[in-house]
């Protein structure tokens, strides 16, 4: 062994110790991925002959281990963990894009979602979602301030689900054909006009013939006298199997006066089936209007959707976090703070929602711990130290041989 080989051995094993030490030091770092050196032997050829000369060892590259770390529950809304493929995409103040598995995020003073280094978590905000701007080029820092206020919305749609009881045969003998022979109980629902004023609608049914019903809608509002009739001419017809065969989408309009200030409302009849069994009628009502509300809380779903909960008891999707992945993540360039930057060898980023095909799963209120195996790294440290000591001992031996040769007389 030559002095050059021993020096080479000292340098390489010193680098090996540094790599293992870095792994051990980051055993508790959130989202940290361990690295392993890839060694290769150095071979040279003699200038004067074809003799092959072994010249030591080198490190060709660091192999990054992107296996999953263990998820640790924190019960904190802005702690996120990824299982399998995917990175959080973050943006620094200069607009450079980085990638991380550290899902510990915060809200800054401007209500941006940021990591511990102040980098902005990217995704889509409420405006992009409402306008169906789902292109990757529209990813931007997620900002919740834009969703602080949920503007009032006038009712434009009412959904009505009902199962009615066909009892015409039992009453037909004592009533005229065109008389109302069966009345349902009155059901009410609160709707909203464009000025955020609530109004109560009463809805009831009258059976007027076999497989025919009349739908009655009235306003039960103190501000509008005489229980204003909105419509009284909705006739619902069913076939012999109890399926609705008349129009299932109706327009609610005022019939009597101009007191009403509601926007046009569409009444949708969903799954409206008539049953002849002796069951109780079942009616469900819902509508899409509400008064204004302020954001009081939000939660992040497993697909990255951010759901805002407002003081008016409404819930709205106000943003979405998207993940990035790479064909060759081992070639990402490590940066300070458990982040990586893309390289030519890593390939271009591919963006998608958590849980989509090829993308990992997102777990809220969890953090991914370091994937460092301490037992393995401590063994590697012992091996690296032994190798270093062996190279140092070889260096001493070479040094003594050289001194002996120099001192020969």
UniProtKB/Swiss-Prot annotation:
InterPro entries linked: Falgellar_hook_FlgE_sf, Flagellar_basal_body_rod_CS, Flagellar_FlgE/F/G, Flg_bb/hook_C_dom, FlgE/F/G-like, FlgE_D2, LlgE_F_G-like_D1
One Pfam family this sequence matches: FlgE_D2
Cellular component GO terms held in the UniProt record: bacterial-type flagellum basal body; bacterial-type flagellum hook; cytosol
Species of origin: Buchnera aphidicola subsp. Schizaphis graminum (strain Sg)
Sorted UniProt keywords: Bacterial flagellum
Tagged with keyword Cell wall biogenesis/degradation: no
Name of protein: Flagellar hook protein FlgE
SUPFAM superfamilies for the chain: Flagellar hook protein flgE
Biological process terms in GO annotation: bacterial-type flagellum-dependent swarming motility
Subcellular compartments: Bacterial flagellum basal body
Residue ranges crossing the lipid bilayer per the database entry: none
């Amino acid at each position: 062994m030559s002095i050059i080989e021993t020096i080479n051995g000292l340098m390489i094993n010193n680098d090996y110790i540094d790599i293992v030490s870095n792994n051990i030091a980051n055993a508790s770092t959130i989202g940290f991925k361990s690295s392993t050196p890839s060694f290769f032997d150095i071979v040279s050829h003699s200038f004067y002959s074809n003799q092959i000369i072994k010249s030591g060892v080198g490190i060709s590259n660091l192999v990054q281990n992107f296996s999953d770390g263990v998820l640790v529950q924190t019960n904190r809304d802005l702690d996120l963990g990824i299982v399998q493929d995917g990175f959080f995409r973050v943006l620094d103040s200069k607009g450079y894009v980085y990638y991380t598995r550290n899902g510990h995020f915060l809200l800054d003073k401007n209500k941006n979602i940021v990591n511990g280094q102040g980098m902005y978590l990217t995704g889509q905000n409420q405006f992009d979602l409402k306008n169906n701007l789902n292109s990757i080029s529209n990813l931007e820092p997620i900002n919740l301030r834009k969703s602080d206020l949920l503007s009032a919305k006038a009712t434009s749609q009412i959904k009505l689900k009902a199962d009615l009881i066909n009892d015409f045969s039992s009453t037909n003998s004592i009533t005229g054909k065109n008389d109302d022979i069966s009345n349902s109980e009155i059901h009410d629902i609160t709707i909203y006009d464009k000025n955020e004023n609530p109004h109560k609608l009463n809805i009831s049914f009258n059976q007027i013939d076999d497989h025919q019903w009349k739908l009655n809608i009235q306003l039960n509002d103190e501000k509008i006298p005489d229980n204003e009739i909105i419509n009284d001419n909705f006739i619902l017809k069913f076939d012999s199997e109890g399926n609705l065969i008349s129009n299932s989408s109706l327009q609610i309009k005022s019939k009597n006066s101009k007191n009403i200030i509601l926007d046009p409302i569409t009444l949708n009849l969903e799954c409206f089936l008539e049953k002849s069994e002796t069951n109780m009628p079942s009616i469900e009502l819902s509508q899409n209007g509400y008064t204004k509300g302020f954001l009081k809380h939000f939660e992040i779903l497993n697909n990255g959707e951010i759901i805002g909960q407002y003081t008016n008891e409404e819930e709205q999707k106000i943003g979405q976090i998207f993940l990035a992945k790479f064909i060759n993540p081992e070639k990402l360039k490590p940066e300070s703070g458990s982040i990586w930057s893309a390289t030519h060898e890593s390939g271009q980023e591919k963006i998608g929602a958590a849980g989509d095909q090829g993308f990992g799963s997102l777990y809220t209120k969890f953090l991914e711990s370091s994937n460092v195996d301490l037992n393995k790294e401590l063994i590697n440290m012992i091996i690296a130290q032994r190798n270093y000591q062996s190279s140092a001992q070889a260096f001493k031996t070479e040094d003594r041989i050289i001194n002996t040769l120099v001192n020969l007389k």
